[in-house]
Regions:
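Alpha-helical scaffolds flanking conserved acidic
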Residues: 55, 59, 69-79, 85, ...
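Helix-turn-helix repeat elements of alpha-solenoid scaffolds
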Residues: 50-54
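Short alpha-helical scaffolding segments that buttress acidic/His motifs in well-ordered protein cores
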Residues: 29-33, 73-80, 102-107, 142-150, ...
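Nucleic-acid processing machinery
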Residues: 1-19, 27-28, 35-42, 46, ...
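Short, solvent-exposed loop/edge-beta patches enriched in aromatic
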Residues: 19, 65-72, 94-97
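Hydrophobic or amphipathic alpha-helical targeting/insertion segments
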Residues: 78-111, 182
Length: 357
């Protein structure tokens, strides 16, 4: 009985605020899955029936919903996330041609991902280029595969994830998320993959972050309060907050610079969000007037955006107590793009606007 309600619960959650045609599509998708899975016999003695397969499909769909994707992408994510379902022709007949067409692109992309892994970085770069060329017809297909991998890595406490899968994630999935500008997905894929590949290193960095959490939070809170006051005096409307650091990026920086954990300045980091570009540079002036900046650690990605259109000002300063501090400054629009990348506009296209989120 619990299984029967999985689709209904998921539908009630993700359909809120979507237009009627999108809700109808999601309902057709759930009905299709129920019909197919309820009619399938267990595949072997180790098969727990449809429960885990349903959970994976709807879990992938939930991740795509959290990315503000449209109903077609959610439907494809749910269907693609459940193995051993009938093919594209069945989906076309029961759910609709647009969903079937996108599912076909997902399967094509999956074929590129399943090619034998190259051992050299140049080979991996070539695979990524081929992957990007393949997905040009519909970028949403890439988001479906990223959501699948993210679901599997999140579930690693219940389902074993091999070091090979984690390595593939670091060489293909995480860079793909970066190219698409979906930074929080990239960071989570990297952190979870490191936990699989280097569990002791992951635990050690996590432990050190936890041990210093109180000290770090007190420091950041004081910095945030001081910066808010100075921005207010300068009549700059801005949101200032601490910025979380990610275990994989900390580990990579420790490796690249041969540093110990305590030597990493950007474990202490804050973010400033302004209303327009002019105020970004004005806020930068305030930061540099408060604390001495480190010229080699300054990057202007507003004037010179990254290839995935990421824009922000990055600076590092000698903050209070002579501790180094990283500061990122960007507009709220730039921040939305940095968080969701190419996924940012799909719900607007579907209808319902941001209220649908």
């Amino acid at each position: 009985a619990v299984v029967a309600h999985d689709g209904a619960d998921w539908l009630a959650d993700v359909a809120v605020g979507r237009p009627a045609h999108a809700q109808a599509l999601l309902e057709r998708c759930c009905n299709y899955i129920d019909t197919v899975l309820d009619g399938q016999a267990p595949r072997n003695e180790a098969d727990f029936g449809a429960t885990a397969r349903r959970a994976r499909g709807y879990g992938v769909g939930r991740i795509l919903h959290d990315l503000d994707m449209d109903a077609q992408t959610l439907a494809v994510g749910v269907i693609a996330g459940i193995d051993d379902l009938p093919g594209v022709s069945s989906v076309k007949a029961e759910v609709g041609e647009p969903v079937a067409a996108l599912l076909a692109v997902v399967e094509k992309l999956r074929g590129v991902l399943d090619l034998p892994t190259s051992v050299d970085e140049g080979g991996q770069a070539e695979r990524l280029r081929r992957l990007l060329v393949t997905m040009v017809s519909d970028v949403r297909a890439a988001l479906v595969l990223l959501a699948e991998r993210l679901y599997d890595l999140r579930a690693q406490s219940r389902v074993s994830v091999s070091p090979e899968i984690a390595a593939q994630t670091l060489s293909l999935h995480a860079p793909l998320a970066s190219r698409l500008g979906i930074w929080h997905v990239k960071w989570e894929l990297e952190d979870l993959s490191l936990r699989v590949r280097e569990p002791e290193i992951y635990k050690d960095i996590a432990r050190q972050l936890a041990q210093r959490r109180v000290d770090r939070e007190c420091y950041i809170n004081a910095v945030v309060e001081r910066l808010r006051e100075e921005l207010g005096r300068a009549e700059i409307v801005a949101e200032v907050s601490g910025r979380p650091k990610h275990i994989y990026s900390i580990w990579r920086k420790m490796q690249a610079k041969s540093l110990g954990f305590h030597e990493l300045f950007d474990v202490r980091a804050v973010r400033v969000l302004t209303e327009n570009v002019a105020e970004c540079y004005a806020a930068l002036g305030v930061v540099h007037s408060l604390w001495s900046h480190m010229p080699r650690e300054f990057d202007d990605y507003i004037a010179n955006p990254k290839s995935n259109r990421y824009q922000s000002l990055h600076t590092a300063v000698i903050g209070p107590e002579s501790r180094t501090l990283e500061v990122q400054i960007r507009t709220t629009v730039m921040h939305a793009h940095a968080e969701r990348g190419v996924a940012a506009h799909w719900r607007y296209k579907e209808g319902g606007g941001p209220a649908a989120a």
